[in-house]
């Protein structure tokens, strides 16, 4: 190899020119890359219909757009009055903002419009409108029921409505629409059950997946509340509470951003301080980071070319995984450091001949581990695997072929002879701890055997980045406002809006018997507010002509408990005649009513395909049992049978929580299989490269031991493993393979050699850099980052220690050489 060039000569080297050209191409690709957070990237390649429904609800469902608001405190003699005033002013401000499609706080803002709408369209909305109901016998029975209401608490309202609605359609519809449980009222607005909190429900216009829009909406709520506090007497001590999917998303994003910035800055300071202590040169430090930056650029570009977009999770995980690349430059600069008696070029040639083959084998080992992800059925894992492979290979190639030219001819690092000598003595003594390691592994295996049933988490909630106190506040506010859980859904596809509505009506007819028997507490249905055209026509056809209806009403008033004259119902006959002539109800007619919001949420269209959704409510259980049992669940078999009886192809009953957990379990199983396949590939690679089963086992043993001990530690701490732990273990193997290979390295003899002092120092520095980079994540407030830090930090350190303990004994003459 030629003498490493310096100054401008380095940039005329073919390898450097090719590297610069590659960076330019990567920059062009990255500049045109779109980054996405769409969860469909982490669906299987061929997702089930249920999984599609799950992602649609997470992205754009009604619940994803809800912000639950609480107002606590408020000074003065009557804090409840202060909170009510704040609630009214806050609601009024938000209702005028286009960012919100609905604001509910208990005020009867749309009640008058809703009642007028129901009154005007009662004969197309009421499921009771049938030919039988408007026969002479049916009218007689309906009129009798309405007359009975005159003696009840609703008598005044019934008396006023009787001339227009003797069949009681309005009363039945209003009762049906108001059937859901509402929060209690205090001073005219919603309040918590204990009366210590005013509550509101805001529905954003933007989808829940639009985090930026959700952040703007949340900021609007805060500013509106602050303005209301300033304008309301005795309100200075009032406190605003918010929760909901959008709030969680924004808070999590901000927390992750803050933690990543804080911990990254701290880890960067530690790594820079560590490397400067060894390198003594800022220039060498900057050069050492070039392989990492090059790997990141190449990884992003490769995924962009292969998939069209780069998922945010892939970028986050991949950037963390590629942290292994910083080790390569450490090996180069420390292991090839020249002395006053050795020319830099000779030292570099010796490094390439002696150490590069081992590093290259370590890179291939890491590639084998990550390559297993390329066979995943989940595009998200394929992205992660491709990103890591391209990044690591690029970083290794830059270290081998570019850095030698850029570093110059005169590179000296701090004299590490004393540290190397101490590490050599420690390494020689390390094998004495083998029996201690054996006992540790026996204990780890015993712990894993005892905790095998609960070792892996089977619920997606295990990955939740939401802190426990935020989850508790969410549960409290949901209980206060009765917000929908929307765990259970029946989804009916349709080629058109009318087809979806007709399907919803058929399924509703099958579900109603379950409500009548108590197997189902109730369900929502878009066709309740917007019946299909066919149903509307059938109901209008049930209305008799005016002359026929007049004669039937004369018969209906006979033998009633209260005597009424047929002439009293002239307005009723006129209303029926008007209904027969009016056009069919359309979606636009609901504008301005609360029912329009329900239809918009339950009847959706995407890519020309319509879907009607029927959220189901599980039967309630008594308060005592809720303290000891799980929340109520539905009889899934009965629901599916009812849906099947509707004879609608494509109709689905979906338990969103169960589907999310099932999807997560599939991820875990897929990852375990791929991890095992990757481990087998690594073993085969080492066996071929090392040409010895014994050396292969020696190289693998420290990695397996580190993974076992880390896993046992989680089991003993009662921490269930998740997909994040598994990815962390894969990184332990990737990083630890370099340590194990160096301790099993041969240098021109048939026997393994004791690692040289500079090699031991390079391994220690690389390990400390890895621990600084990953270990600090253990102090993150975000559970996902904390999990990754607790896995990789200790695992990397244990891999180095175990590699030293299990290293083969060196030949006597090689001790002297070392």
Each model region followed by its residue ranges:
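Transmembrane alpha-helices and their membrane-interface boundaries in multi-pass membrane transporters
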Residues: 305, 321-337, 356, 360-417, ...
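Hydrophobic transmembrane alpha-helices and their membrane-interface caps
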Residues: 285-331, 695-742, 775
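Pore- and gate-forming transmembrane helices of large, multi-pass membrane proteins
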Residues: 289, 341-376, 750-780
């Amino acid at each position: 190899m030629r003498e490493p060039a310096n100054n401008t000569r380095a940039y005329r080297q073919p390898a450097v020119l090719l590297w610069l050209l590659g960076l330019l191409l990567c920059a062009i690709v990255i500049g045109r890359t779109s980054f996405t957070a769409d969860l469909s990237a982490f669906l299987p390649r061929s997702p089930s219909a249920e999984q599609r429904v799950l992602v649609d609800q997470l992205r754009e469902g009604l619940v994803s757009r809800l912000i639950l608001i609480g107002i606590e405190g408020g000074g003065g003699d009557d804090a409840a009055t202060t909170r009510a005033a704040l609630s009214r002013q806050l609601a009024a401000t938000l209702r005028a903002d286009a960012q919100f499609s609905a604001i509910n706080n208990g005020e009867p803002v749309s009640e008058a419009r809703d009642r007028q709408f129901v009154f005007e369209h009662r004969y197309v909305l009421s499921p009771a409108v049938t030919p039988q109901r408007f026969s002479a016998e049916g009218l007689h029975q309906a009129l009798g029921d309405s007359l009975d209401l005159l003696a009840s608490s609703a008598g005044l309202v019934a008396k006023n409505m009787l001339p227009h609605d003797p069949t009681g359609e309005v009363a039945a519809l209003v009762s049906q629409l108001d059937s859901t449980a509402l929060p209690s009222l205090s001073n005219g607005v919603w309040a918590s059950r204990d009366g210590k909190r005013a509550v509101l429900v805001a529905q954003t216009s933007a989808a829940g997946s639009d985090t930026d829009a959700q952040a703007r909406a949340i900021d609007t709520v805060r500013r509106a509340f602050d303005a209301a506090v300033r304008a309301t007497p005795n309100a200075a001590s009032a406190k605003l509470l918010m929760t909901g999917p959008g709030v969680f998303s924004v808070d999590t994003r901000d927390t992750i951003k803050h933690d990543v910035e804080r911990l990254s800055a701290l880890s960067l300071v530690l790594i820079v301080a560590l490397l400067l202590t060894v390198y003594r040169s800022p220039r060498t430090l900057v050069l050492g980071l070039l392989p990492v930056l090059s790997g990141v650029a190449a990884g992003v570009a490769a995924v962009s070319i292969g998939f069209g977009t780069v998922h945010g999770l892939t970028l986050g995980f991949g950037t963390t995984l590629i942290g292994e690349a910083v080790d390569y430059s450490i090996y180069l600069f420390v292991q090839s450091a020249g002395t006053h008696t050795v020319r830099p070029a000779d030292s570099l040639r010796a490094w390439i001949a002696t150490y590069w083959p081992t590093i290259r084998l370590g890179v291939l080992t890491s590639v084998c581990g990550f390559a297993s992800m390329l066979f995943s059925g989940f595009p998200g894992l394929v992205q992660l695997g491709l990103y890591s492979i391209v990044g690591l290979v690029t970083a290794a190639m830059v270290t081998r072929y570019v850095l030698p030219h850029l570093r110059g001819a005169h590179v000296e690092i701090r004299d590490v002879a004393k540290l190397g000598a101490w590490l050599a003595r420690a390494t020689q003594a390390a094998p004495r701890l083998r029996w201690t390691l054996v006992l540790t592994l026996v204990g780890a295996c015993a712990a894993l055997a005892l905790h095998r049933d609960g070792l892996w988490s089977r619920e997606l909630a295990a990955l939740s980045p939401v802190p426990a106190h935020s989850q508790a506040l969410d549960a409290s506010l949901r209980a206060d406002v009765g917000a929908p859980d929307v765990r259970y859904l029946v989804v009916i596809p349709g080629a058109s809006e009318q087809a979806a509505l007709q399907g919803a009506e058929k399924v509703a007819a099958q579900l109603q018997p379950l409500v009548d028997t108590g197997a189902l507490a109730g369900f929502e249905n878009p066709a309740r507010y917007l019946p299909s055209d066919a149903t509307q026509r059938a109901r209008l056809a049930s209305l008799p002509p005016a002359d026929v209806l007049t004669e039937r009403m004369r018969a209906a008033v006979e033998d009633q408990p209260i005597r009424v004259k047929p002439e009293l119902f002239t307005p009723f006959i006129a209303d029926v005649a008007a209904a027969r002539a009016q056009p069919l109800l359309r979606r636009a007619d609901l504008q301005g009513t609360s029912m329009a919001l329900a239809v918009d949420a339950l009847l959706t269209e995407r890519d020309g395909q319509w879907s009607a959704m029927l959220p189901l409510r599980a039967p309630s259980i008594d308060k005592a049992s809720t303290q000891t049992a799980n929340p109520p669940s539905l009889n899934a078999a009965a629901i599916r049978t009812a849906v099947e009886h509707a004879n609608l192809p494509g109709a689905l009953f979906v338990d969103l929580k169960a589907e999310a957990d099932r999807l997560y379990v599939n991820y875990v199983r897929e990852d375990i299989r791929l991890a095992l396949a990757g481990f087998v590939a690594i073993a085969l690679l080492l066996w071929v490269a090392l040409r010895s089963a014994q050396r292969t086992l020696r190289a693998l043993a420290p990695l397996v031991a580190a993974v076992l001990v880390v896993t046992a530690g989680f089991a003993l701490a009662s921490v269930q493993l998740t997909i994040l732990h598994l990815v962390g273990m894969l990184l332990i193997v990737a990083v630890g393979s370099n340590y194990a290979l160096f301790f099993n390295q041969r240098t021109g003899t048939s026997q393994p050699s004791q690692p040289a002092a500079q090699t031991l120092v390079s391994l220690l520095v690389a390990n400390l850099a890895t621990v600084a980079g990953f270990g600090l994540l253990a102090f993150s407030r975000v559970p996902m980052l904390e999990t990754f830090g607790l896995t990789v930090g200790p695992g990397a350190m244990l891999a180095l220690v175990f590699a030293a303990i299990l290293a083969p004994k060196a030949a006597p003459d090689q001790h002297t050489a070392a």
